[in-house]
Amino acid sequence: MTPENEIKVDPPAAERVGRELSRWFGNSDFATRPKPAELHRDSGRHVDWARVLPFLLMHVACLAVIWVGFSWVALAVTLVLYVVRMFAITGFYHRYFSHRTFKTSRAGQFIFGLMGASAVQRGPIWWAAHHRHHHVHSDKPDDVHSPVQHGFFWSHMGWFMSHKHFAADLSRVKDLLKYPELRFLDRFDIAIPTLLGAGVFLLGVLLKHVAPGLGTSGWQMLVWGFFISTVAVYHGTYTINSLSHVFGRQRYKTGDASRNNVWLAIITLGEGWHNNHHHYPASVRQGFYWWEFDITFYLLKLMSFCGLIWDLKPVPAAVREGAGKRL
């Protein structure tokens, strides 16, 4: 019997499910990614339900707030973790790993990656690869999260649920692949969020024991501090892909639909100045003018004063006021 005539037997269902679930834990190993032929056949709209189940359960877990109740300390932890992790995404995953708008030490780079991984948006290599792809194809057919091309839902969250886009074009991030510690974060991208969730739970247990008057518990802190905070960071981040290419003002002619939106800038610590960013992605600052609120830039500037980062790339005046600016 020739190879062409051989009968192909699918592996047992349990093995297939196990293989799919194992892909949730990795992205760096080539064997975990769809083969080129699979990517060619896949339209990109096939949702990989086995892999996205944890993402969906994260939302369902927020409903447990009905049972765990409310306390001011739980709300405070939720807000702190929202700001810290949103900054980790905007300042580190976006402005550092994706665009290299400043420099840091190798140890600092790893710490930035750890902080970004705590936001449960996968590893820095995967995140940066997709974002660099977006800038090359912004609002063109190959832009996987363009609302202009694919509509609101797909640009907001549907794209990363797909089998096809679980993979990333690693040719765009060769500068990051040379660091084994970053590949480790991508390979085990669920590890840091798991540790954070456990830590938040234990904090609640401790506070219930030493300060019962605060009215919190391990389960309450887990629901508020981890699940609700994480989901809020999710959708705050996703609005930049979906809403900031639809609503707002275009200061510059960038060849795409990117907009500046003050409300999105507030909830994302400065990322809402998206038209500015697409006009000049190399700048560490996205609020080009003093009145454009950019908390991420202010925090990065503070870090530079402390010597943690350096060589912050500014917006050249000629770029800010030059060609492409609308009157």
Q: What are these regions, as identified by a protein language model?
A:
Residues G69, V246-Y252:
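A short, flexible low-complexity segment enriched in Lys/Arg and Gly/Pro that occurs
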Residues L243-G248, Y280-R285:
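Interfacial helix-loop-helix junctions of multi-pass membrane proteins
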Residues P147, W154, S244, I266-T268:
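Short glycine- and Lys/Arg-enriched binding-loop motifs that mark or flank ligand-binding interfaces
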Residues V173-E181, Q250-W273, H279-Y280:
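Active-site-proximal inter-transmembrane loops
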Residues Y234, Y238, S242, V262-E271, ...:
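Short amphipathic alpha-helical segments
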Residues M1-Y238, S283-L327:
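Non-catalytic, topology-defining segments of multipass membrane proteins
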